[in-house]
Curated annotation (Swiss-Prot):
EC code: 3.1.-.-
Any GO MF annotation of the entry: hydrolase activity, acting on ester bonds
GO BP annotations, alphabetical order: DNA damage response; regulation of DNA repair
Localization, UniProt: Nucleus
Class of this enzyme: hydrolase
Residues that bind Zn(2+): H266, H268, H278
Gene Ontology CC: one annotated term: nuclear body
Organism: Bos taurus (Bovine)
Annotated TM spans: none
Role summary: Exhibits ester hydrolase activity on the substrate p-nitrophenyl acetate.
Protein name: Ester hydrolase C11orf54 homolog
Description of how the protein assembles with itself and partners: Monomer.
Major localization listed first in the record, in broad terms: nucleus
Length: 315
């Protein structure tokens, strides 16, 4: 499987603090960005399989939207233990957003990836969640993957942030009350693009929506049998929801595409109250509060890039 490697521009954490503080202030009423020790992510509300997101950071984009749209390509299935080896980091902790492993589940879903991949010293741990449309009432069904399934698959497309899963220094971002039009992730990504221009910066991590509600979507359980050829077609196919805090989100974003047909940002979320899906934006700007922990990635790995592409279905 084709895998291209690219070295990101990697600013210091201190420099990123200043850049993000300035950019976020244009979009949120209260902004506080600082360098801190990564909190213990095994604790609530994160409940990740590892304590941190530090060490040999990298972003992987696997597959892509053209394997889902206009029509699904069901040959495009992946294994996260193999991906960890492809990105030169066997045993990596991988988090991110992707399509659920329909090859195991038997249906399509939103996937919130949290996987400690296998290494010589320890077996893999799958802390991932998946969200599907409830066939009974059209609501959200969120489940922990490992409660029923024991593989490490994903499918079609995935945007991943990988590291050694170590404790260490990270960027903490606290914002309250959205005053601008951009969602939290888009604001950070566009801030980086504006500042760094043609020097692409990649970031990932985790954030909590502590107060408020957000617009999300979940893909239908059945892949579309008729071609979806535009954002309008896709939006008619998706199921949209308003979900309530607290939500744990898994963002992966890149300031500018260095020529790999990247999805520039992709964020999925889960909760401990049965809601989860693909994050779009908060719907309660006057009360929303975000708290996040982020790191820049050293490398980009582009795995199984689609040869034929298009630009829709990436919101």
């Amino acid at each position: 499987m084709a895998c291209a490697e690219y070295s990101f521009h990697v600013p210091s954490l201190e420099e990123l603090v200043g850049v993000l503080q300035k950019g976020l202030t244009d979009n949120f009423a209260e902004v506080q960005v600082s360098v801190v020790d990564c909190p213990d992510l095994t604790k609530e509300p994160f409940t990740f399989p590892i304590k941190g997101i530090c060490g040999k950071t990298r972003i992987a984009e696997v597959g892509g939207v053209p394997y889902l749209l206009p029509l699904v390509n069901e040959k495009k299935v992946y294994d996260l233990n193999k991906i960890a080896k492809d990105i030169q980091l066997p045993g990596a902790f991988v988090l991110g957003a992707g399509a659920g492993p329909f090859q195991t589940l038997g249906f399509n879903s939103e996937f919130m990836l949290l996987v400690q991949t296998e290494s010589e010293h320890r077996p893999p741990v799958n802390g991932s969640y998946f969200a599907r449309v409830n066939p009974a009432d059209g609501g959200c069904l969120l489940e922990k993957y490992s409660e029923k399934y024991h593989d490490f698959g994903c499918a079609l497309l995935a945007n991943l942030f990988a590291s050694e899963g170590q404790p260490g220094k990270v960027i903490e971002v606290k914002v309250k009350r959205r005053t601008g039009k951009l969602n939290f992730v888009t604001c950070m990504r566009q801030t980086l693009e504006k500042h760094y221009g043609d020097k692409p910066v990649g970031m990932g991590g985790a954030f909590i929506i502590q107060k408020g509600k957000v617009k999300t979507h979940i893909m239908p359980a059945e892949f579309s049998s008729c071609p979806l050829n535009s954002d309008e077609d896709v939006n008619k196919w998706l199921h949209f929801y308003e979900m309530k805090a607290p939500l744990v989100c898994l963002p992966v974003f890149v300031s500018r595409d260095p020529g790999f047909d990247l999805r520039l940002e992709h964020t999925h979320c889960f909760s401990h109250h049965g809601e989860g899906g693909h994050y779009h934006y908060d719907t309660t700007p006057d009360i929303v509060e975000y708290l996040g922990y982020f790191l820049p990635a050293e490398f980009l790995y582009r795995i199984d890039q689609p040869k034929e592409t298009h630009s829709f279905g990436r919101d």
